[in-house]
Amino acid sequence: MGVSGVLGAVGLLMVLQAAAVQAAEMAPPYAVPLGSDGVQRATITLESYSYTPNHVIVEAGKPVELTLTSVTTITPHNFIIKELSVEQDVSAGKTVVVKFTPVRTGTFPIYCDKRLWPMPSHRDKGMEGTFEVK
């Protein structure tokens, strides 16, 4: 494959990535249900440069358990809600569980700050969302 073929493939990947990010941004917010044990549980999928769902709503003062599943094969990600002191690395193809109890109400950004220098961070590529505590 020549240089023009490589550039064409890179361009196609960038268009597909932008379409995936746009689709994730249009998804409705997900209100996490309260289990019979009083725990709010949700699964969040970490894709190439997006979270699904990317807008999660929980109740303050009740435990939250998030199952974070990376469906990428090479790229590691993380899940950060800085204002709530939540930061979890997720290796490519792995699943981890994060447990915490939010006490502050508000709307907080979720993002991945991983990057391969000199490329933009995953957040700069659209890997961000919203964590809402009511």
Stretch-by-stretch model annotation:
Residues 26-36, 90-134:
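Extracellular/periplasmic metallocenter environments
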